[in-house]
A protein has these predicted regions:
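Structural micro-motif
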Residues: 25-29, 42-45, 53-55, 174-176, ...
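N-terminal "domain-start" segment that seeds a small globular fold
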Residues: 30, 36, 72-108
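Mid-chain, structured segments of secreted extracytoplasmic proteins
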Residues: 49-89
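Bacterial Sec-dependent N-terminal signal peptides
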Residues: 1-8
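Thiol-/selenol-based redox modules, centered on thioredoxin-like
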Residues: 79-81, 199-224
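Short, internal strand/loop/helix patches
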Residues: 155, 163-203
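Short acidic-hydrophobic, aromatic-tinged amphipathic segments that line or gate anion-handling sites
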Residues: 101, 177-181, 210-211
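Short active-site neighborhood of thiol/selenol oxidoreductases, capturing the structured segment around
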Residues: 91-93, 106-139
C-alpha cells in the first residue's frame, strides 16, 4: 500500500510559491471539509506555512481533473492517502470510476467493466518503459494461464506520451491495452509511485494494490 502526503507547489503568484510532492494547487478550489466553505487566501497561506506538507483530499472527475481540494485539520497525521486507499479495499467507499482512451482510440470506463476482473498497471515514463517489460510479461503469463481469461480486462496506464509509448514499448500478443498521459489518474488514486498494479473485482471493488506482481493470484478471484 502507498502512504502518500499531498502537498502543494504554489498557491498562486499573489500568495506564495512552495514545493510539493505531487501537483500544482489551485487556491480557488480549496475548501474546509467540515463547513464546505472555500478557504480564504490568508487562512490558506497560514495553513501551508504551519504545515508545508499539508494533506488535501481531492474530488476529481472521471479523467482525474481536480474539481475540489478538501482540507481536514483532523486528518494531518501523514496517513491521509493510506486511509482513503484502505477504505476502497475494505469496501467502505466505492472505488472511483475512471474514463480513458487507449492509444488505439478505444474509449473505456471502469463502470462498464462490471462482471470482469480488472487489472490496472500504473507505469511511468523514460527508462521505465523498457525496464519494466519483464514485469508486464509476467502478468501476461498469469492471464494466459487462466482457463477463463476472457473474464479479465487489463490496462497499463503510463505517464508517458503516446509517441513515447509507441517508440519504446514492445509487447508481443499482450492482453494489456495501453493508455498514455496517465499522471492525473495516478494522482486521482493517491498513488505517489509508479510500477504498481491494482486489482479490481467483478463488482468494481478494489481488491488490493501490489508492488510485487508475484503475489497476484488471479485464479483466486475468478469462477472455475
Amino acid at each position: 500500500m502507498t502512504n502518500t502526503i499531498i502537498g502543494q507547489v504554489k498557491l498562486s503568484e499573489n500568495i506564495s510559491q512552495r514545493k510539493s510532492y505531487v501537483t500544482k494547487l489551485d487556491k480557488n478550489k480549496v475548501f474546509y471539509k467540515e463547513t464546505g466553505q472555500k478557504i480564504p487566501d490568508p487562512e490558506l497561506l497560514k495553513i501551508v506555512e504551519d504545515n508545508p506538507s499539508v494533506f488535501l483530499e481531492k474530488e476529481t472527475d472521471d479523467e482525474g481533473n481536480v474539481l475540489k481540494y478538501i482540507y481536514d485539520p483532523n486528518n494531518q497525521n501523514g496517513d491521509g492517502a493510506k486511509k482513503i486507499l484502505d477504505s476502497y479495499i475494505s469496501g467502505d467507499v466505492p472505488f472511483p470510476n475512471f474514463k480513458v482512451t487507449t492509444i488505439d482510440g478505444e474509449k473505456i470506463e471502469l463502470k462498464d467493466l462490471k462482471g470482469k476482473l480488472v487489472i490496472i498497471r500504473f507505469e511511468g515514463q523514460g527508462i521505465a518503459l523498457k525496464f519494466n517489460k519483464p514485469i508486464i510479461e509476467i502478468l501476461d503469463e498469469k492471464i494466459n494461464a487462466l482457463v477463463n481469461k476472457e473474464e479479465v480486462e487489463a490496462f497499463i496506464i503510463y505517464q508517458a506520451s503516446e509517441d513515447e509509448i509507441r517508440e519504446n514499448v514492445e509487447l508481443t500478443d499482450s492482453n494489456f491495452k495501453l493508455v498514455a498521459n496517465g499522471l492525473k489518474l495516478a494522482q486521482k488514486y493517491y498513488l505517489n509511485q509508479t510500477a504498481l498494479t491494482l486489482l479490481i473485482d467483478q463488482n468494481g471493488k478494489l481488491i488490493d494494490i501490489y508492488r510485487n506482481v508475484y503475489k497476484i493470484k488471479l485464479e483466486d478471484h475468478l469462477s472455475n
